[in-house]
Every structure is written in structure tokens, then in C-alpha cells.
Amino acid sequence: MTKYVFVTGGVVSSLGKGIVAASLGRLLKNRGLKVTIQKFDPYINVDPGTMSPYQHGEVFVTDDGTETDLDLGHYERFIDNNLNKYSNVTTGKIYSEVLRKERKGEYLGATVQVIPHITNMIKEKIMRAATTTDSDIVITEIGGTVGDIESLPFLEALRQMKADVGAENCIYIHTTLVPYLKAAGEMKTKPTQHSVKELRGIGIQPNVLVCRTEKAIPDDMRNKIAQFCDVEPEAVVESRDAESIYDIPLLLKNQGLDDFVLNHFKMTAPEADMTEWIDMLHTIKNLEGTKKIALVGKYIELQDAYISVNEALRHAGYVYNTDVKVTPIQSEDITKENVAETLAGFDGIIVPGGFGDRGLEGMILSIQYARENDVPYLGICLGMQMASIEFARNVAGITDATTGEVHPDAEHKLIDIMSDQKDLENMGGTQRLGLYPCKLKPGTKTAEAYDNQSVIQQRHRHRYEFNNEYRDLLTDKGLVFAGTSPDNRLVEVIEIPENKFFVAAQYHPEFLSRPNKPEGLFKAFIGATM
């Protein structure tokens, strides 16, 4: 029978619940178990696809085209599994499905209520995560903190799961804060005690406490927490601030968290072989070289807006034993007068995805600087579209080349809306989303980056595409279309062969990068800076 691990948080947000869930998933996977992870987000939006990056951070896209929370990126990078639509569920999605069923008459005239209809739908999503992946263990993280009004239906559903599947088949892990007060020179357990009290008031007794802390928790304090929170002392696990997020699996393993979970489930599994992970960490902590990358984007004020791009750049650096230092640069601030001064000294330039008209001219100036000065350049999604426009304006002589996203009535729209996107009423969930094949042109830098495969699979999130009316003209001027859809209708990758590295992709390669398996384009990009 499938086992269920529920991860909740208390005291404050951003304690690292997602990293704890992902780290435990990695430990259990390395013990030979099939693991999947999901997150429940208590906001009313159906998904984060229409939310501002300043509000939510990056929108992570899964193979099946689901727009999800950025924590799913952590999950995939840690457990190296591709997740699906059941791995991210919001309050909006739950209520939408319940209301759809009610409209179809599937509740047979019953009064639709939070209990049982909403909680049953939540439990159904937990079960579907198990059945669609045939997993031995499902790890479910609940967003927010205990005490939030929005989280109550999810916590009630978790409480009911104990009766539905049996106490021996589910375990509750609660992450809390054990703050260190410098003025007093001591750590405080009261926030943890009150958080557990709140959780128990809802009907959930945690089995494990993961305590976020700056310093090691002394044994006497560990015993105190165990006594007041009614857990075993070995179930009080500290999660200290670490040099790298990839330290956390080993920190948790050294405290026996995976053993405790399996013992609770009465499961036996081989000891986790963490050799590859340990070797990777050794590389991360002993990087010798340094490369400086300029990330020219629109949402740089929030680091989480480009978290997968930043991680993918670091992953690529590990291959070359190099610490990749990423400097975010606001594209709005770049002008003709300051572009050279702003970008001088960088080993590479990357322009990631985005939407809208703000900052586009600064991106185009940055791309022009990279092309003319032979600075390695990688464009992603919007970065590919702006690279096409820059080439058209400054090489092909189409000085008014633009994008239909900003100027829908312009004469020379190098980038235009996809034909199947023109008459859509809804914005949410209607873009070209998910995994699609890309046919590579032999002999290109792009094909070389992917070990000369003829076709690759990549994740997408876009509504606009390269306008094929200009393909022949730009080809004549030296632009190479290195990747297309298999039917040759959609341009996926462009490159300039004369440059050391000038490649731009419509897809999002960052979503498939792993710390121990860097994505091909990122690896080639960093390689070109060596």
C-alpha cells in the first residue's frame, strides 16, 4: 500500500518546507523506493500562470503543461523525477472542480460544503498523485503556515487521511522555527511549542519536528521540545542554515530522518547510497574558477523570479569546476549610452523569459552588444524573440522590426501571436505549454550541445512565435535556424555560427536541469565562457 508523508509549517513562512520535502524524497529514492512529491497552495488562483513574478516568483512548467509553484522545480531537481499536474494543487483548482461537479448534478442534490466535498476532493488529489505515478511514497507539502485561514480545508483533509488509510500508512512532519536571540544568547522553544499546539488543535499530532535554526540544538533542548510537543527525542530534527541547499539531504540523513520515516511505516529498504550526491557536494564546495554572467531581465528585484535559470547556470558551472556568479541587471536601465559600460567585464550574457513591453529595448541593446563583441549569449523564450528582432534590425536592415505582443498592427512583426492563440478569451492555462519535440539541424552548436541528437524534448511556455515570413531573409543574412518543430512550422532555436556562442531557444531549457545532470544548452553556454 502507498505510504503518505505530510509536511506542514508553522511560526513563519519560508522555513524551507519544500527543501525538506525534496531532501527526504531524495533519501527515500536512493533507498530504492519510488517517490513522488506534491504541493498544495492555499491561494484562490487556479494556478500561478497569471500571477506577477513579483507576487509569486517563477512559474515552473511540468511535462504535461501544468503551470506550477517554483517548489516543484526544487522537487524535480532533488529527486530527478518529472512530476505531473497532480503535483501542484491550489484552492482555486479544488473549488473549480467541485463547482463543475455540482453544476453537472454529480452530488445528487446535496448541499455542497467544505466538509465533505472540498476535503474529499483534496484527498482525491493526494490519491491521484500516487496512482498516476505508481509511487511507494507520496510526500505532500502544504503551503503557508498552520493557523492560516486558507489552509484549514487542506489540514482537515490531512487529518482525515489518518483514518482513511491507517495511522501506520501516514506520517506528519512539521517544520518550525527555533530562533536564536543574540541579546539573550540563547535559543527559544516557545514558538515551536505554540505552533504544535495550534496543529494539535486542528486534530493533527505531528510525528516529526524539523526545526529550522542557526545553531545546533543541544540535547537538553531537544528533549524539552520532545516532551512538550509529545514526540520522541530522535524525531526532533534540526535543519541548520547550510552553505548549499544540496547539503540538506545529508544533514537530514545524518540525523536518521529517513530511517525514522521507514520505521514508522514498518518498511525495509536498502541503505541509501549517497556516493554520487557526496561527490557532487565535494565539487560544489571546491570550485576553483569563477565566471561572471549578466542576467538581463525584467523581474530582477525578486531572486525567485529566475530561480531555475540561476540553478541551471550553477549546475553547468559544476561541470567545469567553476563558480558561476550571476549578476541581475534591470533591462529598463540599459541605454545606448551605458550598455557597453554596464556589460563590460562579463563572461557571458543571458536574457531569460518574460512578458509585456517593459524593458524590451534594453534587452535588444544587450543582445546587440553580445553579438558585436562576441560575448557568449544565451536567450530563453523572450530572449530568443528579442535576439531575432535585434538581428533583423541591425543585420538584415529591417529597422522597424518588432513584436506583435507590443505592436499588433506593426508592418514588420518578426514575432507574432500563434494562430491557435488568436481568438482565446481566457489568459490562464491557454499558452503553448509543456513538453514538445524539437528537431535539431545537424552541424550546429545546438545539436552539439545535445550530443548530436536529431530530436530533443523540451518544455515550453509561450503565446508568440517567430514569423516564418522572415525566415528566408534572415537565413540569407546569416542567421541559422538550428531547431524547429518536427513539421518545420515553428522556429525553436536560432544561432549565429560565426560567434563563439550565440544561441537562443523558444523553449525553457532551465526546467530540465539537474545538479548532477546539467542541461545541454546551459552546459554549452558556460563552456563557451571558458
UniProtKB/Swiss-Prot annotation:
SUPFAM superfamilies: Class I glutamine amidotransferase-like, P-loop containing nucleoside triphosphate hydrolases
Domain Glutamine amidotransferase type-1, residue spans: 292-530
EC code(s) of this entry: 6.3.4.2
Alphabetized UniProt keyword annotations: ATP-binding, Glutamine amidotransferase, Ligase, Magnesium, Metal-binding, Nucleotide-binding, Pyrimidine biosynthesis
One of the GO BP terms on file: 'de novo' CTP biosynthetic process
Chain positions recorded as CTP binding sites: 13, 148-150, 188-193, 224
Positions contributing to L-glutamine binding: 54, 354, 382-385, 405, 463
Entries under InterPro entries matching the protein: Class_I_gatase-like (IPR029062), CTP_synthase (IPR004468), CTP_synthase_N (IPR017456), GATASE (IPR017926), GATase1_CTP_Synthase (IPR033828), P-loop_NTPase (IPR027417)
Segments crossing the lipid bilayer: none
MF annotations from Gene Ontology: ATP binding; CTP synthase activity; glutaminase activity; identical protein binding; metal ion binding
Active site as annotated: 381, 508, 510
Pathway(s) it belongs to: Pyrimidine metabolism; CTP biosynthesis via de novo pathway; CTP from UDP: step 2/2
Family matches, as NCBIfam families: PRK05380.1, PyrG
Family label: Belongs to the CTP synthase family.
Note from the entry: CTPSs have evolved a hybrid strategy for distinguishing between UTP and CTP. The overlapping regions of the product feedback inhibitory and substrate sites recognize a common feature in both compounds, the triphosphate moiety. To differentiate isosteric substrate and product pyrimidine rings, an additional pocket far from the expected kinase/ligase catalytic site, specifically recognizes the cytosine and ribose portions of the product inhibitor.
PANTHER family hit by this protein: CTP SYNTHASE, CTP SYNTHASE-RELATED
Name of the protein: CTP synthase
Organism the protein comes from: Latilactobacillus sakei subsp. sakei (strain 23K)
Taxonomic lineage of the native organism: Bacteria, Bacillati, Bacillota, Bacilli, Lactobacillales
GN (gene name): pyrG
